[in-house]
Amino acid sequence: MLYVPGSSFPPVPFPDAPTNLVRTEDLAGLDRGSPVATMYVSSTGGAIRRLIGSAHRHVISVRRDPQMAFGQPTEGIAEGPAMMRCATDPDIGFYQMQPFRLVVPYAGTTGSYIADLAYVTRDGSVWIREVKRSLADLGKPQYVAKLEAVNRLLTRLGWNFRPWTLNEIKGSAERQVNTGIIYYDRAARIDDLMPRFELIAAKIERTTFGDLIREIDPRNTCRARAAVHRLIMMGRVWADLDGLLEDWSEVRLRAPSTAVRDLPFA
């Protein structure tokens, strides 16, 4: 069993861990039945690394997204855009920067790996991302060997583990424009507009971006536009963000996602 100890809680079984995690025939030096690896998460939830101090080699920040329960620490020039991509993508239902530390055996030794990003898509797929400016930043062969060991372990959990480069994160020029505009409205107040939206969503599944704005609040389309941006971030409205979001752009209205899984770092 893979164990997930919090800093102030006793170890607990990792949810849904397949039993073959305790079979260590392919991992020399471990006793049969011992955990293959150990995952550490914050005992209070959210990021495991707080980025406190002044000795960091990269640009650092802590960002807030009202859709998520915890702050989002970023390190390096690619993690900030990755956080914004997750925040604005209507197909991503949950994400957390710096979510866990994994201690895993590889190449005759044991290494510690802190995940840059975890997210869950609307279909329930769990993705763990190694965020880099480019694949050239993966560095030395020993680090690549550690990533390969992490990949083998996370694959056993049914998770997906992939590098994510800055160019992939930013996407097309149109997506970059949409991401910036939508992210600006991440804290738009929509509570009083939700009953109106639910009535609209119960009647129609597809409409245009402009028509939805006018339906939500015809008297204040500026506020309604911000509300639709927030609904995109919530996944309640889907739009193709690789094309400029114009009044005639098609959008789909969706029910709240039920696919987001309970994760030890959520």
Descriptions of predicted regions:
Residues M1-A266:
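Electrostatic, structured charged patches in enzyme active sites and in nucleic-acid/phosphate-binding
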